[in-house]
Amino acid sequence: GRDFPGWRAGKARRQKQVWQNQFPCSFYALRRTLEPNQKCSLFEMYGYVEERADLVQYCREPIGPQLFADAFREARVLTDTIGKRVETHTANPIFDAYCSYTYLDNCLRGGFPLLLGGKQVFYAFSRKHGDLERDYNYFTVKPEYYSQGNGNFRDINQNRRCDVSLSPFVGRSNIDLFFDLLQLDGYNPLQIEPETFVLAQEEQSALAQDCPVIHGLSGVLSSGFSAGQLWRALERNAASPKERELTFAKIIAAAKKQIHASFGEGYWSDHWSYDLDLIEDYLTVWPDREEKLLCDETLTWYPARAGITERCARYRETPNGLRQYNATYPLENSTAGTVEVDAQGNPLRSCLMEKLVLLCAIKYATLDAYAMGIEMEGGKPGWYDALNGLPGLFGSSMAESCELARLLEYTISALERLPHPFAMHREIRALVDELS
């Protein structure tokens, strides 16, 4: 065959190699003349290692066609195993395969739920939908065990809406996560970052009595660590696979999970509408736990990094007519912690019922001048990115109004079912009274 113009395989291999790329692919050069009916298989291998010693160890293994065949088989087993959660058997095998594939796609965005240490609900694989044609959806996935990527609030939320039905052990964990990220203004941060864990010093000391290997993990346990970082450290320090698994489970079970999020850009008008789906799915499995779910004061509030600009400051008269710009502005506490605090510095806690009442009140207050659609006052539309210019044109959405009707219907019916009153912060009560 012909070489690339001006190049030959041997010459290409002698050039300075580029070891980095934005995409998971690379080029290899090979010069081969094929006779009729002959074929040539080219196996390409590229990847990443944390340390050179890992690469040296890996290269000691035989590298050949069998290695790639085994890797392909392992990948198929992994995807088939994930799909087992929704294994379906009907008269239509195409539908059966569709169910498994759809669940696999959900897991690539919402994550695959695991129970670590018999206690901690953990989602592996979650990330943005970073298709090659959507380079604006930048995401990263850490090259480690139990890898997680950064994902948008909506992407993760909408792909976990059936997880209680499919994986009952997740319990109320997603309800807690997404309602903890609710702000007092009814909005939420855009981006959810990979989770980390923190193990208190007293817990470390207690665990070290039964797991001496913990003494060698001080570098990892001294601050927030990921599940993958912990497993990697145990690979280097644990004497046996059994000791590694036992220590990992005990540390994760005793650790406290840390949630990380960032404001991103603007506030989407429909992110909150997925929250009710989480509640409905949970109550489908455990309808007898509704009162406890709604009334336990275990939820916190996420501190807003940006506020909504007043109307008088965001309305503009332009040659093309009235417009709405600069929807948000940074708040002074934009670098504060991950939970709102009261006057004494204690975390501000609420029950789910109070959060639902606030959400109903705020979204009702943002109905447009015709009391039909919910305004896009946060500077962003709903899920359809092509409508990004609509907020500047005083856009509002009827779809979110329908979601508000759903939320009001459930909240009112739940209030009627509760056998006793629940506490509300006076500021939230004042807002509700003013709107009523």
PLM ranges: what are they?
Residues 1-436:
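Acidic, mature catalytic/reactive cores of soluble proteins
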